[in-house]
């Protein structure tokens, strides 16, 4: 029994040793790929990762080289802006309804000119490009407003246009003004629209009013002219033309220029002296020369008289033309101290007269009111008297009838 047990133990140990030997041999001989690539400390792996696997080295995130951005990417980042609000959606808590309506009209007009609402703002330092929403968000309608300037009618200083990236189009000009000015401009704009509608309908009253306005504007804009013939007498000049010149200077034409044209005739303005006396003399040169000399002397006297008159009126002038054909005096009247004192005195007198008239009107009104009150009182008294008389008569009739019954 003991021998059997010993043999069994030895046999089991031998089997274990044999199995362990087989496993070791199989691992060392059969799995050569594991022996080649499985060991982390093997030199072949280092060779494959560092040198052999070029794609791994090229596209590894850690070893990737940072390339510079293209121009398109840089421009795209520069163009990136924060979210811009549509100007039509901006609501104003300040200001009146008329101011809000005026700004809405300006926004609509800007949209017709520039649909992306890019504008040019007139500032003290010059023109600056803005988006309309940037200005509207910082605008206080109770104080300030906006003005859209037409480049066709504006001056050269304000019409300096610059081409931008928006296809080379000219941006609309805007100026910050007071609210009153904006409302006044909006009211004139509405009046013009109404007039155009009435003209389309064919109303005659609007046409007449427009004609009157145009005539007044032409009178204000045009320089006034006085025409003097060379053949005028000294008496006529002193009586007629001096009064015309004085009236023109006195009637509100203080600083404005006016022209004095000295001509032969209205029809023949530039007619020369040489052609005047040819038909009279009939080829006689001596008579013609004598007449021309006399005419020149007379014209010179007329010029001297006019110059002396202008010096009396404290005017400055510039002479253009020639005695032989035509002469024009470009006159600029200067307001003297005497005229200013007289005008101030006249204004004071007019103001005093206006005050007195107002006082008289007040006194007259008071008198009228007092008279009306007296008349009303008299009428009331007369009514009360008539009612009392009627009552007394009724009482007497009642007493009389009572006595008769008794």
Curated annotation (Swiss-Prot):
Question: Does the keyword section mention Zinc-finger?
Answer: no
| UniProt biased composition (Low complexity) | 38-54, 69-79, 371-385
Q: Where is the transit peptide?
A: 1-18
Specify the domain of life of the species encoding this protein: Eukaryota
Q: A Pfam family this protein belongs to?
A: mIF3
Record's signal peptide: none
**Where does the UniProt entry say this protein principally localizes?**
mitochondrion
Q: Which UniProt keywords apply?
A: Mitochondrion, Transit peptide
Q: Which InterPro entries match?
A: AIM23
Q: Region (Disordered) spans which residues?
A: 29-79, 335-406
GO CC annotations?
Answer: mitochondrion
List the subcellular locations.
Mitochondrion
Q: Does the keyword Mitochondrion apply?
A: yes
Similarity-based family: Belongs to the AIM23 family.
What name does UniProt use for this protein?
Answer: Altered inheritance of mitochondria protein 23, mitochondrial
């Amino acid at each position: 029994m003991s021998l059997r047990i010993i043999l069994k133990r030895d046999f089991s140990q031998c089997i274990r040793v044999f199995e362990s030997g087989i496993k070791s041999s199989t691992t060392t001989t059969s799995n050569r790929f594991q022996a080649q690539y499985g060991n982390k400390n093997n030199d072949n792996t280092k060779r494959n990762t560092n040198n052999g696997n070029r794609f791994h080295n090229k596209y590894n995130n850690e070893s990737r080289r940072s390339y510079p951005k293209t121009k398109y990417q840089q421009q795209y980042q520069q163009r990136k802006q924060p979210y811009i609000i549509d100007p039509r959606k901006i609501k104003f808590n300040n200001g009146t309804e008329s101011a809000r309506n005026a700004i809405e009209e300006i926004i609509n007009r800007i949209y017709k000119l520039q649909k992306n609402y890019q504008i040019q703002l007139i500032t003290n330092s010059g023109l600056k490009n803005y988006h309309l929403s940037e200005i509207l968000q910082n605008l206080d309608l109770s104080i300030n407003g906006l003005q859209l300037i037409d480049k066709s009618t504006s001056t050269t200083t304000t019409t300096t246009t610059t081409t931008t990236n928006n296809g080379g189009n000219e941006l609309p000009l805007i100026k910050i003004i007071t609210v009153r000015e904006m409302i006044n401009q909006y009211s004139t704009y509405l009046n013009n629209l109404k007039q155009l509608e009435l003209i389309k309908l064919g109303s005659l009253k609007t046409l007449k009013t427009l004609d009157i306005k145009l005539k007044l504007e032409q009178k204000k804009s045009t320089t006034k002219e006085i025409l003097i013939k060379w053949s005028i007498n000294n008496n006529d000049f002193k009586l007629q033309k001096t009064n015309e010149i004085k009236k023109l200077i006195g009637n509100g034409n203080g600083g404005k220029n006016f022209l004095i044209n000295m001509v032969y005739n209205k029809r023949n303005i530039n007619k020369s002296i040489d052609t005047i006396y040819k038909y009279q003399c009939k080829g006689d040169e001596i008579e013609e020369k004598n007449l021309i000399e006399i005419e020149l002397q007379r014209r010179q006297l007329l010029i001297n008289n006019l110059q002396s008159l202008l010096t009396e009126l404290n005017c400055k002038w510039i002479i253009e033309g020639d005695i032989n054909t035509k002469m024009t005096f470009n006159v600029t009247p200067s307001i003297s101290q005497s005229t200013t004192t007289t005008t101030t005195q006249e204004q004071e007198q007019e103001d005093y007269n206006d005050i007195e008239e107002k006082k008289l009107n007040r006194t007259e009104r008071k008198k009228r009111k007092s008279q009306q009150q007296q008349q009303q009182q008299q009428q009331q008294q007369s009514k009360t008297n008539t009612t009392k008389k009627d009552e007394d008569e009724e009482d007497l009739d009642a007493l009389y009838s009572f006595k008769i019954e008794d």
